[in-house]
Amino acid sequence: IFAANKVAYSTKRKKADQSPYETLESGLASCTGLSILLISACRSVGVPARFVGTPLWSDGSGNHSWVEIWDGEWKFTGAAEPTGEALNQGWFVDRAAGARSGDPRHAIFAATWRESGLHFPLVWLPENRSVRALDVSERYLKKSATIPEGLARVRFRVRVGELRFSAAVRVIDPSGTVTFEGFSKDERFDGNDHLTALLPLRSRYEVRVEGADPVSIAVERDEQLVELELALLPALHGAVEQGGLEALLRSELGRLPLGKGDAQPLLQLLVEQQGKRLTAERKAEHEARQLEWGGVRMPFWSQSFSAAPPGRRSLWISMHGGGGAPAAVNDQQWENQKRLYTLEEGVYVAPRAPTDTWNLWHQDHIDPLFSRLIENMVLFEGVDPDRVYILGYSAGGDGVYQLAPRMADQLAAAGMMAGHPNETQPDGLRNIGFALHMGADDSAYNRNQIAAQWKERLAKLAAEDKGGYAHQVVIHAGKGHWMDREERAALPWMARFKRVPDPEKLIWLQDDVVHRRYYWLAVDEPKAGTRITAVVEGQNIRIEGAKEAGVLRVRLRDGLVDLDRPVAVYRDGLKVHSGKLSRTAEVMSRCLLERYDPQAVYTAEIVTGAP
């Protein structure tokens, strides 16, 4: 039931004796909370179950709680360490075998409704003697395996700061032979559950964990505990190698604060690991020149021009016209688009629209398909994610009008040729270059008149917002829908621009196709029509228009602000954060898992609710 309800063991839970509802709500519980949840689940389907535990193991290492169920007799199962259908098993069997019946500190007690003359020792609330109990220690004394004479149980624990960490532990004797190896237990396991080896008494060993200083030990007693300290960066490296970037979202390790000097090498590691994973997963689709998202397929054609060094090549995504026509017509438009423009440098990509409808390039599947196309070109073709450009003619121009504002955080510039904007607005174009070319006589759907209106609007926006809305608008005299390729002048103008991944000011207007992420902002539940303005002024961040945005995430990194100094965030005039922020692997991993964009990975995050 724990995995099904996304509940995990953690000493970070709010309190020890959480109700089932509190545990389900928080997703975290100690062995006590997990036991209460399991007991409630068993009783709800008619399985008798009761709470069991000890105030203190006889070796003084801590306390523990678990569950007994009735199956012809009382049998136990772990709560923090479930064993499935196997009963009377658990890591604590040996510990329980040392229980001392009749000792209020070291006995094992089971909760009961009967008048028993005993009370259950609640270690988190010792003055409360209201829970009746039975001393069931005798049944556990027989469960432990006998320890051979001359041997001792040696426990191993690896820590990163205050967190237990799962790492490969090797025990090496003086001759250099590995006599024992295994993985230490992390925070998913009970705090008293350790990797254990049976070793001869009075023997000497060296204990090694990669990334930690080796520790020399002498085996002196049973239940001996050996602790090793691991630095954060090697621990993160090991976690990523074992479980990928997702491992840093699931563990406390990913939330430990990073120093400024650790953030960059960790970023390189995360980018490399995620890049290897995506390269393996997507190689076939890239070679097939066809992408798929949500059951929709988008073939594409590409040609390279005067290749720059890997990682510095530009990408030009060129959208064909047509739409609202038979597939054969749109196929011909695709063929035309392949040869319409040439580049001085870069990768020229002409995708085939997934549908033949009038709105070829601005349906909700286009954005994720283009994001995936950009990611793949970065991975396989050495494209610089800061030099990505989109352009389109006719119906392709319609797409540019719509895609450029809502995908601006992934673009350097956009070129609109002979298209119609429909309902879209230019607000989101603030931080990219935008070229608009139109034939003066292209009167169908009032394209020429609307282009003239956009020329005025863009000029006004640029005048009122210094440093924003760079644009080139050319209305070609004497030209109709076909401009005799005069619009090619847009390409060298666009090529002057590089993406600004961390603009000090951004305007995020959600279109009918909504996005969860835009530059250094993100929302949990995007809503069409919301318009957010966000500005960085030194260490202060001011956000306006976010009243309807719900949960808003402000993502930061060094360079945009100084993360070693306090940061203040104002949301619609209300101060919602003031203080220093931690750089964490969790935030970095989440950014890369959302989108493989190595130049747009943030290290810190402030989560704000609606004021």
Predicted regions and their residues:
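Short Pro-Gly-centered beta-turn/loop motif in secreted/extracellular proteins
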Residues: 186-206, 210-212, 220-222, 559-563
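Hydrophobic/aromatic-rich core segments of domains that either
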Residues: 1, 10-22, 26-27, 32-123
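Structured interaction patches on ligand/partner-binding surfaces of diverse proteins
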Residues: 210-235
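Gly/Ser-rich "nucleophile elbow"/oxyanion-hole loop immediately N-terminal to the catalytic nucleophile
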Residues: 305-311, 358-394, 406-410
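C-terminal catalytic histidine-bearing segment of alpha/beta-hydrolase fold enzymes
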Residues: 443, 449-451, 455, 461-542, ...
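Active-site machinery of serine-nucleophile hydrolases
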Residues: 312-379
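A domain-start/cap signature at the N-terminus of enzymes
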Residues: 229-313, 575, 583-597
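A short, amphipathic beta-strand motif
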Residues: 152-161, 169-171
